[in-house]
Amino acid sequence: MTRSPLAEGILRRKLAEAGITCVEVTSAGTGATDGLDRDRMMLEVAAEAGYEISGKTRRADSMSAIGSDLILCMEPHHVSYMKGIIPHSYHHRIHLLMKWALGSSEVVYDPTCRPKDFYMSVLADLERACEAITQKIDRQ
């Protein structure tokens, strides 16, 4: 699991910097196995950028999803997965991250087993999205 914990770390920091304390941010992966170590390259990229993403992997589950006000997914198949594990009445909470944050059709692709530059590109995409999310929340 690489992108979700990085997005969580970025968003937590941006919200804190904006003085927004009423939002709880968590992450989970649709393909993750609970309790594994995080991706080493993503840990390195995150640390270089000053983000804290320590912890273990966590698989997305229906109870956590139902308890969430907003579920942001990296790729369309994640949206489908999430819609498959929660009741239809909660589907309105599920969105593609880049579409919800920036109105963009971009997808945040999985950098696993790719060069470090690809990880850096994912970091930049997530920073843009998390900045936009922070601004949206701050305006509410």
What is each stretch, according to the model?
Residues 1-68, 135-140:
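Conserved active-site segments centered on acidic
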Residues 70, 76-140:
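Phosphate-binding/catalytic loops
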